[in-house]
Amino acid sequence: TTNLTHDIYAGYWGNNVSGFVNQAPTYSYTDGWSASRWKHFYDDRSTSEYSQLVKTFYFCNKDYYHTAFYITRIYYAFLLSMQTDTYGDIPVAYYVKGAMPPEENVTYTPQKEVYNILFQLLDQAITELHQENLPAVSQYDLGDNDKCYGGDVDKWRRFANTLRLRLALRVSNVDPALAQT
């Protein structure tokens, strides 16, 4: 939806004549496209799926869900990075903990702080997914439920490191010290 929003904006300023009478494209901006991404992130991902996993991890057998939890943190960091790159300052404080804000008027977190949170999420996940930190007990097997990497922890760690590099490149001109952490 982000790409569609930007395409509509660019198309509005471009000249496109189809050659047919009354067939010129319309580039009317529809709030639903932008709102869809926002709603999907906060309603579907943050408050239902991610929140449920966080609660399961903290109140059930941590060893059993260890791998699934930290893989999900990596994926959530990826979604969160796209959200802040699209909207800038966003509400994060409660959602990243898997909680609902106490009222509807949530506090927006400045984008610089969101990036700090992203680096913390990724650093923690990378550390916890190293072989020596994995619990000795049998893990919840993601297997076919992991559509990206089939539950391969090494591939998820590589993705997390790649995402860290991408985020570091994004902030390198604004905050070189943060980029080098």
Regions found by a protein language model. Give the residues of each.
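Flexible, solvent-exposed coil segments and beta strand-coil junctions
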Residues: T30-W33, S138-K147
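Carbohydrate-binding/catalytic loop surfaces
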Residues: M100-P101, L142-D152
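Short acidic-aromatic linear motifs embedded in glycine-rich loops, typified by GG[WY][YF]DAGD(H)
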Residues: T1-I117, L121-L122, E132-P135, T181
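Aromatic-residue-lined binding/catalytic grooves and analogous aromatic/hydrophobic interfacial grooves
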Residues: L4, F119-L142, V153-T181
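Short, well-structured alpha-helical patches and their helix-loop capping segments
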Residues: P110, V114, D152-R157
